[in-house]
A protein has these predicted regions:
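Residues that cap or initiate secondary-structure elements
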Residues: 11-16, 58-60, 105
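Short secondary-structure junctions
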Residues: 28-36, 90-96
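A general secondary-structure signal for short beta-strands and their flanking turns/coil
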Residues: 1-4, 45-49, 92-94
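Extended Gly/Ser/Thr-rich low-complexity repeat segments
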Residues: 21-25, 60-85, 95
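Beta-strand secondary-structure signal
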Residues: 4-6, 51-53, 98
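Short, extreme N-terminal segment that most often corresponds to the first beta-strand
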Residues: 1-24
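Short, intrinsically disordered low-complexity segments
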Residues: 31-76
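Short acidic DE-rich linear segments
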Residues: 96-105
């Protein structure tokens, strides 16, 4: 499943480094490459918004690698659980961003 996720942050220059480092680590753990695409950031009212496409191969590999943690995450739908897991995973790596699932297919 491909996820379209909106990233929100008030400090993108700092968070971008942490975010990309964390996702690159996830790619290595899941034995995938080029698993996500970041669009150009847009700034409004002190916030920066970035649309991300999380490709199916990285998503499915993460679902397998972290199945128990995702299952325990908050949310009633699988998409919510996955997004909440990813937020917590990023927070544990000092990346303080917000994620909003825009679409999944």
């Amino acid at each position: 499943m491909t996820y379209y996720i909106q990233i929100s942050t008030i400090d993108w220059p700092k968070d971008q480094v942490l975010f990309e480092d964390t996702l690159n680590t996830l790619e290595k753990l899941c034995d995938t490459q080029n698993g996500y695409i970041l669009n150009e950031p847009v700034s409004k009212f002190g916030w920066t918004f970035i649309d991300m496409i999380l490709k199916a191969d990285l998503h499915m590999s993460m679902e397998q690698e972290f199945a128990e943690q995702i299952k325990k995450s908050k949310g009633s739908k699988p998409e919510e659980k996955f997004t909440n897991f990813l937020v917590k995973y990023l927070e544990n790596n000092n990346c303080k961003i917000k994620l909003k699932l825009m679409q999944s297919n």
